[in-house]
Amino acid sequence: MTAIQTALRSRSASVLLSSAPGVTTTTGTPAMGSFDVERIRADFPILGLKVGGKPLVYLDNAASSQMPQPVIDRLVRYQTTQHANINRGVHYLSETATSEYEEARRKLQRFINAREDREVIFTSGTTEAINLVMHGYGRKFIGAGDEIILTTLEHHSNIVPWQMLAEEKGAKIRVVPINDAGELLIGEYEKLFNERTKFVGVMHVSNALGTINPVKQMIAFAHAHGVPVLVDGAQAAPHMKVDVADLDCDFYAFSGHKLCGPTGIGILYGKAALLERMQPFKGGGDMILSVTFEKTTYNTIPHKFEAGTPPIAAAIGLGAAVDYLSGIGMDVIAAHELALLNHATEQVNRMPGVRIIGTAGNKAAVLSFAVDGVHPHDVGTLLNQEGVAVRTGHHCAQPVMQRFRVPATSRASFAFYNSMAEVDALIAGIRTVQKVFA
């Protein structure tokens, strides 16, 4: 028996949080006031897989989460009983698909507490959502000599579009530094503001380190200077309660595939007043009211930003995913994931020769680490041989790697369906790596 298998057998996989509300899963029985991870895991068929004869331990949730059976079932139901193109069709299937698509929009509105459903735009993912803001807002309102504030922690998707805009317009990017724990230096952030500051882009949670940024505080400061803020919420929306009204953010972007939903779908929330002033990102069907060769009149929001046939099935699947997560409760999810992170952090800190990269006091369930003398890709390869899936590389956050003077890290990222036994399996796997390279 391998160290991984021993860890999985020696520790109960059931984690109970006595303060959690009841959870109803596809097993049909509510958890009755406790969070039972085994009942949750029963909803995820893929978690029963074996890798090389060993149980799959999926700890790559920051890259993409797994999909529960209710979401799979909803996608099948759409494809087998409701599939049609939306809008303008007067037949049963088209009207049904249109209704379900717009209901998914309303579900996302409620999930993030947007004021109106027209403030929710379906995109292909976080990357397209950010690019939509860059093209629709940035190209219209940011010009030569203007400044855009980003942070060292940003994913490349919230750096490259703004670099493209800065090069096109003659604007300048200013960067908020971080400390050795991977926390933003808020005092330095505030010093960057001046009369030329026109936009702020900041991630809610660092995908590379797990740092939870004080975005509400940052938004308030920016607004005091008349500057709008886009929040990259790709790593926050799946793991904690997001309230865009409370944050008062101007834009908020996230992806479906990190949220137990399908790939190819994402969300851009934008304040209606800003969206109405923005230019469309793409031209095509459904984003227009009228077209002649002389002039096109654009549709109202959100439709003017959804050109062509949208990802209908994916949107409906994402609606089912947020139903599933809401049924568990985002606060419950956050509490369970924090318990996993704390246990993993405690165990890794006891391991000589293993260093955690990113030790912020306020973190989401991301654990980036480096094993002395072992390249992260070798760590990932050996863990995979034990059935443990982690992500290795720069995590599309090369400025973060440069700040910590590492080429890459190994990253374990937890979800609510992970168990304490799986954390122990990760630790056992790291020990195996150290033995191989001893």
Regions found by a protein language model. Give the residues of each.
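Pyridoxal 5′-phosphate
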Residues: 2-438
